[in-house]
UniProtKB/Swiss-Prot annotation:
Substrate binds at residues 77, 83, 90, 104-105, 114. Pathway: Metabolic intermediate biosynthesis; chorismate biosynthesis; chorismate from D-erythrose 4-phosphate and phosphoenolpyruvate: step 3/7. The record marks 21 as: Transition state stabilizer. The lineage of its organism: Bacteria, Pseudomonadati, Pseudomonadota, Gammaproteobacteria, Vibrionales. Keywords: Amino-acid biosynthesis, Aromatic amino acid biosynthesis, Lyase. Pfam families: DHquinase_II. One of its GO terms (biological process) is amino acid biosynthetic process. It comes from Photobacterium profundum (strain SS9). InterPro entries: DHquinase_II, DHquinase_II_CS, DHquinase_II_sf. CDD domains: DHQase_II. One of its GO terms (molecular function) is 3-dehydroquinate dehydratase activity. Its EC number is 4.2.1.10. This is 3-dehydroquinate dehydratase. The active site is at 26 (proton acceptor), 103 (proton donor). Belongs to the type-II 3-dehydroquinase family.
Amino acid sequence: MSTVKRILLINGPNLNLLGLREPGHYGHHTLAQLVADLTVKATNLSVTLDHIQSNAEHELIDAIHQAHGNVDFIIINPAAFTHTSVAIRDALLGVAIPFIEVHLSNVHAREPFRHHSYLSDKAVGVICGLGPDGYEFALNAAVRRLQSES
């Protein structure tokens, strides 16, 4: 009997403002809608999806640390921490859980400071610019990867 795989969805700073903040870049979906839709899809794919959103870097790092031994895959939208956080990078490397980096907007079509990611070279993959669909694509890719490892 196989165990149900667990995926942790991490959303970084200001993503709690989805639906309000710069809808031209981020769309009109709220974070609650995005997580609810993804949770249904995860259930249909027979995996468990846990979620955290925080504007505090240390809370995201703590969640990554707590994922060790409890989570099989991470989907992370580090938001602004993408471009600044060596600490989140080190946490992900420390727990050695595979992860996909997701961004709602195309970070490469935006300000130059958004072009660099401290995570992308260590990610299984990076999805950007596809809005909420990017999360679904990441979920499907994570599940396929976990199934291929079983």
